[in-house]
Amino acid sequence: MKVSIIGATGYGGLELIRLLHQHASVDIATLHSFSAQSETLATFYPHLKDLEASPLEKINPTEIIEKSDTVFIATPSGIAKDIALPYVDAGLNVIDLSGDFRLKDRQLYEKWYGKSAAPTEYIAKAEYGLAEFREKKETTFIANPGCYATATLLGLAPLTKNKLIDPTSIIVDAKSGISGAGKVPSASTHFTETNENMTLYKMNSHQHIPEIMQQLTKWDESIPAIQFSTSLIPITRGIFTTIYVKPKNPITQKELHTLYESTYENAPFVRIQPENVYPTVKQVTASNYCDIGLAYNEKTNVITIVSVIDNLVKGAAGQAIQNLNIMANFAESDGLRFIPVYP
């Protein structure tokens, strides 16, 4: 399969290149960048010197359609809604890593992203690509989930799909490494601001909130809202999500683990930790795994769920490739069979 990557010089695009080079059924046909053309990636990223010699090109839809079966779009939000359309119309596989096609309500997108929304007919065509819970596996247009949304939804799915929790009780405390803020530097991501520090940001206003709610209410329409906070922590990669919920009825630790293990028994990238063991960010670094730890406090009737991912892999490029595997009828783990980097 021939693929093109639009937005190849961003962190998400770079991860796509790294991972796709390990995929036996995929060849990278073209690489595209808004910020640089006619130079190779190694000009900007010397670690790719022996990996990718193809020059960066301007975006030419006609050429991309001729040379590619699949297009990955790894741009910031607000761009894909315009540039994705020719490839969708041409019938190519299109996987968008930005947030432009995730929300089915255009007004919600414009409220939370502060940008004009994609055309209604294209939003309707896009399937939300939470890979473990894809409903239409034959769909060729995927809105790849956000990193916070992926960790949160995988953590909550077994309980919410079975309507086992008090719908008003969901509290999510999510922490991200600095790469989650993207490649463009800012005052808030400057080394002197982030090193030895922890910063709460976008309190009650992170753009992944409506995305999470959209999926949760598909599973349990009685959920009215979630309390969701996000923090930057001084690590490069990783999402560490701690979720607190109250079950409708008391549940034992064994019942809780059995529920999660049965839900994910056929999911190659979700690993449920043993009882009283909680995952760390390092145990999923540079991998497509989501590791989940569970606890139930009988005294407070609170379930704690710890869900960790690598924001650039399971939270972006890795899940995008997982979605490609599903739509192309490859093995779901093709190109993603590697162990995390440790330490």
UniProtKB/Swiss-Prot annotation:
One of its GO terms (biological process) is L-arginine biosynthetic process. One of its GO terms (molecular function) is NADP+ binding. InterPro entries: AGPR_AS, AGPR_type-1, NAD(P)-bd_dom_sf, NAGSA_dehydrogenase, Semialdehyde_DH_NAD-bd. HAMAP family: ArgC_type1 (MF_00150). It comes from Listeria monocytogenes serotype 4a (strain HCC23). Belongs to the NAGSA dehydrogenase family. Type 1 subfamily. Pathway: Amino-acid biosynthesis; L-arginine biosynthesis; N(2)-acetyl-L-ornithine from L-glutamate: step 3/4. It comes from the Bacteria. Keywords: Amino-acid biosynthesis, Arginine biosynthesis, Cytoplasm, NADP, Oxidoreductase. It catalyses: N-acetyl-L-glutamate 5-semialdehyde + phosphate + NADP(+) = N-acetyl-L-glutamyl 5-phosphate + NADPH + H(+). The keyword Amino-acid biosynthesis applies. CDD domains: AGPR_1_C, AGPR_1_N. Catalyzes the NADPH-dependent reduction of N-acetyl-5-glutamyl phosphate to yield N-acetyl-L-glutamate 5-semialdehyde. SMART domains: Semialdhyde_dh (SM00859). GO terms for cellular component: cytoplasm. The active site is at 147. This is N-acetyl-gamma-glutamyl-phosphate reductase. Its EC number is 1.2.1.38. It is found in: Cytoplasm. Coiled coil: none annotated.
